[in-house]
Each structure stands twice: as structure tokens, then as C-alpha cells.
Amino acid sequence: MYIYCRFLTNEDLDEFNKLNAVRGIYIHSDMTTYNLDTGSYTCKRLFSSSTSSTLSDTRDEFWLDMPRFHNESYEYFACVKFTTNVLSIDDLGEIFSQKISPKTKSVRFPKREPKNRYLRVIGGDNPQYPIYVVSRGRYDEKCAKTVKELNMMNVPHFVVVEPDEYDLYKNSFDSLGYTYSEVLKLDMSYKDNYDTLDDRGDTVGKGPGGARNFCWDDSIRRGFSHHWVLDDNIEWFRYFTDNFQRKMRTAVCFKASEDFFTRFKNVAMGSLCYTMFLDSKDKAYPFVMNTRMYSIIFIRNDTPYRWRGRYNEDTILSLDCLSNGLCTIQMCAFSADKITTQRVKGGNTDMFYSVEGTDNKSQMLVDVYPQFAQKVFKFNRIHHYVDYSVFNMQLEYRDDFTTDNLDKINDYGMRLVNIPKEWDRTYKDSREYIESHLDECEEVDMFNIPL
């Protein structure tokens, strides 16, 4: 068994050594591995060559009149891989002074205090453009992750479901008090006529693409030039800056993002990044250009393409846009906690992934775009790999947009508060309740949070 342990300061390392002196364990900052059974260890190399890039980056120049974004890399004072074939879980718990399980792979010493767990971003406005959540078989509170979050954030949205599940969704959401959710019946002709890009017909599920095309056209019928379409398995939305991810109880993540995306005449799609892809200790930029859009997607309605493909339809649509000279933007300043593809019952999991795995999914993308995609095996299953480096288009402002007189920072009315821990994940952990009970919360400096 192995566990990586990170120490932020020299004082943390000294505390660890004092705690474990009786065991004969002594760690210094140059160590990289330590065998708890034998006391043997390895150290860092004395010399290393720098691999840091000296190339300039222009993304910050575009980040005007937007929320603060500043993430510089920082190093832990020490990071050591501890190994053992002898010690028990209880022994390890005593050594690291925290709960350890057989699945534990990484800890920080001392254990991080949970106080930041109850920080919430509030304030600001709702988005200008409609939000659609495409859902299937996820109408109860446990599975309707995105819908629950949007209600806790007080964000109006549409939930698109197949007609045979309409009553299940409507009754469930009514009983849960999800007043911000409007359930729409999918026009099944969108599913029947959907281009799956294969010859398997109705023998397996067709995926969410047909419903997403319905959302696209529905937003046009309602008079909108853009729309959002979200997966139904999002647990949190976050604001990332100063090396910390803040949980949001506001829709500023959508409002600020759409304001940014629509500044440019050659941006067809935007999305929010997955939180799990953003390392809080690494240098980061507020957005990434010309890559795949997924799960929390913003689309310009006059884009001359539509969803297609039984699998990997998000990557296919992204490549449709990119290969024809249009840009995409993935936000890093705002992110979403996405439940992994095959962990939640319903949706595509019940359609095919739980039966087929992911091989067919990856193969379809390779068949459609062989010049960009290939299949690889990693993390114990088949994945696809796409080389996005060939897409180097630059952002172009709309002709009627000017940066004159723009401030560098626009906080969009966001505030940060620390809620009582007993409110966490209850009905009180909602924007409406928090903002009406601010006297019971502690206001916190948004940009001065102990890491």
C-alpha cells in the first residue's frame, strides 16, 4: 500500500516528525519516498533542468471586465510517497493523524480543517440565455443532480424528458419543491430522425443528441440567439481564483461566461471546465481555447451544425466547429463537479455504457474524425485521444464590441459567506435562504482564504 503525504510548510513537517518520533520515523524535505516497514528512503536529484516555458500568453489580455482570476503555482514544502506491506489501516491512521481507508492514496498533513467546506458564493444576476437540462431516468432527488443544484442556486431552467417519463419528472419535482424547473416533453421526432452515424438503428439507445437538437430549436423558437445545454449529473458549480475553488450559490458562473463568449464573432461554443481537471496548486489561465466542449455547453444558435452521433456527440460537434475555422472556449475561472460517466443510474449509463463499456464510444469518434482522433487504453478502459493542437485560430471581437473604458475586474456582485455547518446540503444551503439570513452567516474576504 502507498500513500502520498504533502506538507505545506516546514512547521507541518516538524509536527509530523514529533508525532512519529516514538516510531523512529524522521522525514526531511528532500525525501521523495519512505518505506515505513524498513525505514529506507530515496531523495530528490541534486540537479534538474528547467522545463518552464518562456512563451508569452495573450489570454489575460482578453480577460477584461470579468471576475478576478489569479492562480500562480506553488510548491509543497515536501511531498513523500510512504509505502508499507505490514502496517494496518489503524496504524496508518495514527501515523498521519487522520482517518485512512484502503482506498486512500493521498493526504495532507496536518489534515486540512473543514471550515472552507461551508463557504458559498452568493449575489449577482441570472443568465440572459435559457438553460436546458437533458435528462433520462433521473427524476428522483438522489439522481437529479444538476436540477437540484440549479434550484439551490435559484436559476430558472428547462428539463427536457421523453413523454413517457414526463409525469414521473413533473410529480417528483413538484413534491421536491423544485419551482425553478420547467419540465418539457421532448418532440420524439428529434430522436427518431437523429443521425446516429451508424447502422444500428434502435437496437441500442441513441444518446442525448436528439434531445439536444430539440433544445437548440426550442431556444430559437423562443427568440434567443444562444442557449445552454447541461448534463443532468452535475453536483456543484465553482468559482476558481487565488488557488481555491469556491462553491457557488449564484448563477454568475453562467452570466459572466456567456458575457465573455458572446464578445467574439468567431466563437461557436463555450463550456465550463470540470473541477477535477483544475489543480489548485498549479498556475492556470481563466480559459482554454479551441478544445472539446462538454457537459455544461453554451452554443451560438446560428452555428451551421447540429448534434450527431450515437456516442461522443459533444466531441464530434466541437470538431465540426473547430475543423471549419470556428473557435471554442472552455472556462477555467468557473467549473463544475461532474459525476463520472458510469457512476449514476439513468442517462447514457442505462442506455449503453453499463452494457457495452466505452469501446464503441471511442471507435465512433475515430471513424468520424480519423485525422484528429485515436483510441488509447488507460485507467483500465478504452478512451479516445484527440490532438487539438492543430487548431490555432485566434479570438476576434465582434465589430460592435470595444474594450475602451472597460475595467479590468468586474465581480458581478459576488460575495463570499461562511454558512453554519448544519446548513450544509440542506434546504437552508440555497441562495434564497442564505441571502435572507445573512445575519446568521459570516462574510469572508473572497480573495484571502487560507489554503
Where are the predicted features?
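Well-ordered, non-membrane alpha-helical segments in soluble/globular domains
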Residues: 143-146, 209-210, 244-259, 355-360
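Conserved catalytic core of nucleotide-sugar-dependent glycosyltransferases
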Residues: 236-323
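Short, aromatic/basic amphipathic alpha-helical patches
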Residues: 15-22, 91-98, 145-150, 168-179, ...
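C-terminal catalytic/acceptor-binding lobe
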Residues: 124-130, 138-141, 309, 315-451
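Active-site-proximal specificity loops/subdomain of glycosyltransferases
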Residues: 163-228, 235-246
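Short, hydrophobic/glycine-enriched beta-strand segments
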Residues: 6, 79, 128-136
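Short, well-formed alpha-helical segments that are part of the catalytic scaffolds
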Residues: 130-157, 161, 165-173
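Compositionally biased, non-globular sequence tracts
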Residues: 1-124
